[in-house]
Amino acid sequence: MPKMKTKSGATKRFKKTATGFKHKQSFTSHILTKKSPKRKRQLRGTKLIAKSDVASIKRMTAC
């Protein structure tokens, strides 16, 4: 059986860390005027992937 190809989109979106995978928070690119400063502040930075999604991310990124 041939090797599975990695999903190139997933490779760009998720980075492997020591404890799991991190990703950029969504809802931060446009239409920011209606979002409160608190909401925008909390959307900053990166978040860790939920434990239930780690297996599927591993399959997509071949880590």
From Swiss-Prot:
Region (Disordered): 1-22
InterPro entries: Ribosomal_bL35 (IPR001706), Ribosomal_bL35-like (IPR021137), Ribosomal_bL35_CS (IPR018265), Ribosomal_bL35_sf (IPR037229)
Swiss-Prot/TrEMBL GO biological process terms: translation
GO cellular component: cytosolic large ribosomal subunit
Record protein name field: Large ribosomal subunit protein bL35
Keyword Ribosomal protein: yes
GO molecular function: structural constituent of ribosome
Protein family per UniProt: Belongs to the bacterial ribosomal protein bL35 family.
Organism of derivation: Marinobacter nauticus (strain ATCC 700491 / DSM 11845 / VT8)
